[in-house]
Amino acid sequence: GVGRLSLDRLLPLLEEAAVLGIPAIALFPVTPPELKSPDGSEALNPDNLMCRAVRAIKAALPDLGVICDVALDPYTTHGQDGLIDDEGYVLNDETLAVLAQQALVQAEAGCDVIAPSDMMDGRIGVIRKTLDEAGLHHTRIMSYAAKYASAFYGPFRDAVGSSGALGKRGKETYQLDPANTDEALREVA
């Protein structure tokens, strides 16, 4: 099972984790349906759930590392990781600027490691440039070098509330085919 925790339940659990010597935790948001939009604008809100959680964690446990997911699927009405056109095709280049701004608001909230799970081509360079221009040189980026358009992500999509919005659409246009090992090896090289 996948658990979801509100902020009031999260902090006591993280205090236990810190006592156990766990150095960092990863956050994935669940966005209420009324805050979702086609462009995922809630991802850019400096007072969204993710940013509030980061600030609360850093206030209570400043030495605990915080890893923040960067992707639009928890914030979009269509469940895709990026912006889409009228036919539902994901717009890679247009999405990059939004992802960079999402990473920026998370880093400004205190996130230690940005983890872009969206799989848009070129995202790492654009995010790094945006963070550096804002003086956030020490914010690290954890690259998802290879991510598959696989049913194994079903529980995750359920957890962040994006699976229902996807319907019959998939993420094959920007995530790897699990059967294509050659492509996976090229991506991670």
Role assignments for model-derived ranges:
Residues G1-A189:
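Alpha/beta enzyme core
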